[in-house]
Design a protein with these regions (language model features):
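Conserved "ABC signature" C-loop
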Residues: 567-608
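Helix-to-loop junction immediately C-terminal to a conserved catalytic motif
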Residues: 531
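Transmembrane helices of ABC transporter permease
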Residues: 178, 210-221, 225, 287-337, ...
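Cytosolic ends of transmembrane helices, especially the final helix of ABC transmembrane type-1 domains
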Residues: 341, 361-364, 388, 435-463
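Catalytic Walker B motif of ABC-type/P-loop ATPase nucleotide-binding domains
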Residues: 637-641
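Loop segments that connect adjacent transmembrane helices in multi-pass transporters
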Residues: 249-250, 254-266, 337-387, 457
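Membrane-integrated ABC transporters
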Residues: 1-188, 201-210, 228, 232, ...
């Protein structure tokens, strides 16, 4: 039996993950474990969410058949709802305007039972309430003939265990250190009780020797704690460097389709997830170990003194667990609401800050300000609910602790009065109980944070499980030009409309090939396919008669120079934007800049271009982009709208560059609307 059992409960990581979570839930229902990240990819979930077609195609790859049905719910009564075939994915239109998917697993006379990815829990509600948000679109699920229960994707538990296995030596040292700290704390408590009894019984003893013993214990405790702090800091740094290094190394080798389905904010948040996981592996596990050892030791000590004292300590555990369960159940839903509110607020701020000039032109400042304020108020109102629950939980825990402390004082005092317990034992009981309370609170804090840590591990494992671009393959001959050929190429982004449908053309060395067509017809997509940024759905893309799928990605992209539109510049100097890690002299950099007509008298190579090149005009940015391509001396040139930001002089300069590159025997492919380039082209292909 597999250690990692399948489940039907999945909570979405982001606001667009409800569709993939429903696929994971269905797979779990049929006994197959699937990761959310994998479900996102096979369903072509993008930044706007998942389409019904994407859900159907993704389910097909899992061996599940989904039959889409649309119906008018105004004619449905309770009997028709009860006849709904389950399981089924149901589309909801929420009152806040968001589109949502849930999985219905059962119906009865009382209502419908469904799994909601918003909180990852099962819910039951009446048919009347459910139909108020249901759009009438159902995806009826059934197992296909090729269904297999072989797990697909990486689960968060497996990913966390792999991390723990990588750092098991450090974790073991932390456990030993926690055990020693607990032992010294208990030794201090027992010694306090012994000293109290000796003082109360004899009234005369060598206090200085006892003081030295206490000082020794405190010194040893300080040493262990200081070592623990330093050790945790060292391990935290190593885990940070290791995880961030692995994430960066993996992230920039992923296919372009991955970045189509995820926002920049989501990628940045994965780096924050590294910090959460690091805290769990270092401080969390060692804190859990120290707390666990202390709880066990306290229960043993108190039971050895008195059964009521032991039962008092044990009784706190279910009380704390109940509080923890209640808070976790609320926070699970609250986290999703915060995620939705934060996503809406962040997207609004990003959009309106980027459009600030247009907002001023339209005199819409007040409207935008009110819109952003409402989004922020919704976010704060949602976060306020979670904050209040947490504070009430802490207050409840403190109250329970106070009651338990009073109980221990009363019971200990009663035992002292009847001569069953000494004053020293009471001191021991109070001291270890104080340790017990702080340890239980620490363990509860770990338990409360566990769902967030698990989600962070799941989100990070989703990225780490994405297959990288193929790095091996045939190496193209350096310095040689190759023909580029498309044979009946078809391509679509995700499961959307076809961008290219049976497109064919051939570009030859020593020739300029011009590709024209209206906006959105697939001209820029053609350039990305040549670079093997995406895989064609069908057809062949050949470089020198070799399929781009068989060519080494590094070799392919070194052979091809690509000038994109608009120019993509880093927030760095002009020199760094042209070199991009390569070793060229300043003289060579200046030479290619002069070829493009860049005015070196106005700008130095050390000038920072700003974020996205905002310190430069569009024409200047385009010249730097062309210079960056030329300095690498590629044998195949692909230029996307090279004259878009150029004036008459700039266009003439670019046309001269194209002639020179053609005359030197290179393969030149130009994508443009500019009619002036028609006279320059040797072959013209129109995309329709």
């Amino acid at each position: 039996m597999s250690l990692f059992k399948t489940t039907r409960l999945f909570q979405q990581h982001g606001i667009t993950d409800c569709g993939p979570c429903c696929l994971c839930s269905l797979a779990g229902h049929y006994g197959k474990r699937v990761g959310i990240g994998y479900a996102r990819r096979i369903s072509a979930t993008g930044r706007e969410g998942t389409t019904v077609l994407g859900m159907s195609e993704g389910a097909k790859r899992l061996g599940i058949r989904l039959d889409a049905v649309r119906t008018d719910l105004s004619e449905w009564d309770s009997r028709q709802w009860q006849e709904l075939p389950v399981p089924a994915i149901v589309h909801l239109s929420k009152s806040n305007g968001l589109q949502h998917f849930v999985v219905a697993y059962g119906t009865s006379a009382d209502g419908i039972s469904y799994m909601d990815p918003a909180d990852g829990l099962m819910h039951e509600c009446s048919f009347e309430s459910f139909s108020g948000e249901c759009s009438g679109v159902f995806l009826l699920a059934s197992k296909a003939s090729d269904f297999s229960t072989v797990p697909t994707g990486t689960g968060n538990t497996r990913f966390l265990l792999s991390l723990i296995a990588d750092y098991k030596r450090y974790i073991l040292v932390s456990f030993v250190c926690s055990l020693l700290i607990m032992a010294m704390s208990f030794a201090q408590a027992l010694l306090s009780g012994w000293v109290t009894d000796r003082l109360a019984g004899q009234g005369n003893m060598e206090i200085k020797y006892i003081s030295l013993v206490f000082l020794g214990i405190v010194t040893v405790l300080f040493g262990f704690n200081a070592f623990s702090i330093g050790y945790h800091a060292m391990v935290s740094k190593q885990i940070d460097n290791s995880l961030v290094g692995r994430l960066c190394g993996h992230l920039f080798r992923l296919p372009a389709s991955f970045f189509d389905s995820i926002s920049v904010g989501e990628v940045v948040s994965r780096f924050l997830d590294v910090s959460r996981i690091k805290g769990y592996v270092t401080e969390g596990l060692s804190g859990l170990a120290l707390g666990g050892f202390t709880v066990i030791g306290t229960v043993i000590v108190l039971f050895s003194m008195s059964l009521p004292l032991g039962f008092c300590a044990v009784g706190l555990i279910p009380a704390y667990t109940l509080v923890c369960w209640h808070v976790n159940r609320y926070l699970k839903r609250n986290r999703t609401q915060m995620m939705e509110a934060q996503a809406l607020m962040t997207s609004g701020i990003t959009e309106h800050v980027a459009m600030t000039m247009k907002t001023r032109q339209l005199c819409w400042q007040n409207g935008v300000s009110e819109k952003l304020q409402k989004a922020y108020e919704r976010f704060t109102s949602v976060s306020y609910g979670g904050m209040v629950r947490m504070r009430y939980a802490r207050l409840l825990i403190q109250t329970v602790c106070s009651i338990a402390t009073i109980f221990i004082i009363v019971v200990s005092s009663f035992y002292i009065c009847i001569g069953v317990m000494s004053l020293g034992k009471m001191v021991v009981a109070m001291t270890v109980f104080t340790l017990y309370v702080s340890s239980v609170v620490s363990v509860i804090g770990f338990v409360i944070s566990w769902p967030e840590i698990r989600s962070a591990a799941d989100r990070l494992s989703d990225i780490m499980s994405v297959e990288q671009e193929r790095q091996d393959g045939i190496e193209l001959v350096s310095g040689k030009s190759f023909p580029v050929e498309f044979r009946d190429v078809c391509f679509a982004y995700g499961y959307g409309m076809k961008v290219l449908d049976g497109f064919s053309f051939k570009a030859f060395p020593g020739k300029i090939t011009l590709i024209r067509g209206r906006n959105g017809i697939g001209k820029s997509t053609t350039a990305r396919l040549i670079l093997n940024m995406y895989d064609a759905d069908s057809g062949e893309i050949l470089i020198g008669g070799i399929s781009v799928r068989d060519i080494s990605t590094t070799s392919l992209r070194k052979t091809i120079g690509y000038c994109e539109q608009p120019a993509a510049l880093y927030n760095a100097s002009i020199r760094e934007n042209i070199l991009c890690g390569q070793q060229w002299t300043d003289e060579e950099v200046e030479r290619v800049l002069r070829r493009t007509g860049f005015d070196l008298s106005r700008f130095s190579l050390d000038m920072m271009v700003g974020e996205g090149g905002k310190s430069l005009s569009g024409g200047e940015s385009q010249r730097i982009s062309i210079a960056r391509m030329l300095i690498r001396k590629p044998q195949i040139l692909v230029l996307d709208e090279p004259t878009a930001f150029a004036d008459a002089d700039g266009t003439a300069c670019i046309m001269d560059i194209l002639r020179e590159e053609r005359d030197s025997g290179r393969t030149v492919i130009v994508i443009s609307h500019d009619d002036r380039l028609d006279t320059l082209a040797d072959h013209i292909f129109n995309l329709r």
